């Protein structure tokens, strides 16, 4: 009987999920994306060669692994085809192994135009969107007016729906945002070109998943972004437009929760965030600059500098509960090498001096909260590339143990560098 494993982020994204998915796919028959779009950026380093994936599951670099894009993913055809071409130029046979659900909502040019126009109009109150049309595409889906991948293969039906959508969205673009209208014929012609290229990769992803399950194959579900960016459970409104938590798996792929055997939560040994929104442990001093420089904290998708801060046990406890995490993977431990003192946030103090140990449920509730820290000794020795727990300095092992105690979940994997081989596996999710 096969095992079905989930890999998802427990912070604000950028936790290092891509590397871990790539590592674990050695045992998987298939890897599935179930939410988000090409706003995700999963970086993989294999034998020193760096690859950044946005839409295609990270299992694509493992020979023979089937890669599936479930119905919960919003697909920008132009971005997907560019990504396919780049991989094929490296000799990866993407079209033979990638399957896409026809129920995926489409991201088209008017979504991108709306996304960027709105963010521009917000000024200083901007959310920090990647400007790639993700939010507007999900809006169309929920409003039941959106075009889906499967519509591409029915020209007349597609053209009629596209005309209605452009009437609606161009009215906003021109009259409210004072931006140029999107051309109907140009958009239609582009989409018909996409249709020819995408058609061979279409599949009923839900049916494929259940066929694999019945055959006893191991399946991996790859989350994008992080739990605190979830549209329902994140720091609203500074969130993404999809369910980044474990609940998104069933709705975004058609694979029910009772079939899942293990949920691996990825967390950095410190905390980062891209864009606007609450960040209680954010550092504006030399330590914050040290973490950013040592950790190469720049977004794989946008190139934006990430905000850096100390490890926050409060938000991680919330993520563990929401996702029913089986075990954690602690990444970027090596970035902390050389710090004399390391701090862990164990609670938040409000204006009245009361200490809160539960994370607030919206962004405004974070206002005025100050982090309560516990200090631990750092270590001067290098942890880079360590392969066993015994290879780590005693202070690093103590830090790992304390994190486990504070969040109430075991750390089953420790990442000590960017390469897939620079990893300590204490308990394998597929074991």
Curated annotation (Swiss-Prot):
Residue numbers binding IMP: 14-17, 39-42, 130, 144, 225, 240, 304
Q: Does the keyword GTP-binding apply?
A: yes
What is the organism of origin for this protein?
Ectopseudomonas mendocina (strain ymp) (Pseudomonas mendocina)
The record's annotation in PROSITE patterns points to: ADENYLOSUCCIN_SYN_1, ADENYLOSUCCIN_SYN_2
* Record-listed E.C. numbers: 6.3.4.4
Please list the residues that make up the active site.
14, 42
Annotated GTP binding lies at 13-19, 41-43, 306, 332-334, 415-417
Cellular component terms per the entry's GO annotation: cytoplasm
* Named cofactor requirement(s): Mg(2+)
Q: Name one GO biological process term.
A: IMP metabolic process
SMART domains, per database record: Adenylsucc_synt (SM00788)
Quaternary structure and interacting proteins, as annotated: Homodimer.
Q: Which residues bind Mg(2+)?
A: 14, 41
Superkingdom of origin organism: Bacteria
Record's protein name: Adenylosuccinate synthetase
